[in-house]
Amino acid sequence: MSKMSIKVSFTVGVSLREALTEAREKAEKLGVAFIEFSFNGAFFAVSPQADIERGIEEFEKGMKAIVI
């Protein structure tokens, strides 16, 4: 597996589920370890194997740095 991560940003109006799903798809397609982005004050690092539901749950619990 690659040790590279790519930082991205999403446009206004994108839901967290959409952002996490697209980040996971891009990480898999590009063969990178993580796609990184911020969403409403929380940092996300999303791997190709990311559990989207876990990411949403951790965000709803108030976590500020979420690696999935």
Question: What function would you assign to each model-found segment?
Answer:
Residues 9, 47, 67-68:
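N-terminal non-cleavable signal-anchor helices
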Residues 20-55:
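Acidic, low-complexity, intrinsically disordered interaction modules
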